[in-house]
Amino acid sequence: MTVVANTGPLAARRKLGTELRVLRDRHGWTAEEVGAHLGCHISKVSRLELGKRACTKRDFESLMNLYDVDSDRRAELRELMLRSIQRTPPWWHAYNDVISANYAEFLTYEAEASHCREHQPLLIPGLVQTEAYARAVTTYGIDAVGPQQVDTLVEVRMRRQERLRESPPLQMDLVITEASLRVKVGGPATMKGQLCHLLSLREVENVSLRVIPFDAGEKGTSTGAFTLFATGVGPGVDAAFIESAETRTIFRDDPVAVRRLDRLFNHLTSAALPQEASATLIEHIAKEMEHSA
């Protein structure tokens, strides 16, 4: 096992949990037996192995002794454990006065993900919004906020976009609908600027943008917007966030729900135009916006 130097607390916790499960299975221990050894309920063992709970130093050493882990492997796993309990505040901690708990959890996954898949049926995804578009959406969105809060939330959204330029950058697969391109958010001029920005993404290798045209019919319909994150710790997607008018985002990490949304994203992708054809459609709509400005 190699510990990635820039592994964040969330990814480290999930990776350590996976390793603990492998060790338990290898030694033939049940979760109940491990819980008895630690002096805790089986639910704690389950949460440790799922990466939903940080492993304390005391529990870590107890588990390493139980599984008879050699010194080299123990040192690697200890590094993961220490990373998983790091308390360095993330950059968005400075915006806690306007960021909800759901949004903070979303930002945590976004910050540590290696791959993101997002579907938006009516709006442009946040990581590829222009500042003018983001301001219009935030000002007239479902949340009633004042001018100062709008400024702060837009600042957060612009800062989030640094993930696309980091090393290594976040890999993004975006699927939007033609409606997302035609709704004149902020007016024709703002929308045209947004469309031009989307066209510039053709030069960004880690961003894939595809559009579901109106003539895709029912194949391009879904119940709403959602985002899938993969941290690269294990195979597939780790978590999903579903947008809701009432709670803003609903977090799901149970495998069944995540796999269902991953399949839905694949279906939506199959209904979308290829990237070049999507760019052609965006160019066409941008010209229409120019004439109506």
Walk through the language-model features, giving the residues of each:
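Interdomain hinge/linker segments and adjacent boundary elements that couple functional modules
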Residues: T2-T18, R26, E32-A36, L50, ...
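The short coil/loop that forms the "turn" connecting the two helices of the helix-turn-helix
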Residues: W29, C40-H41
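C-terminal regulatory/effector modules of DNA-binding transcriptional regulators
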Residues: P168, V175, V185-A293
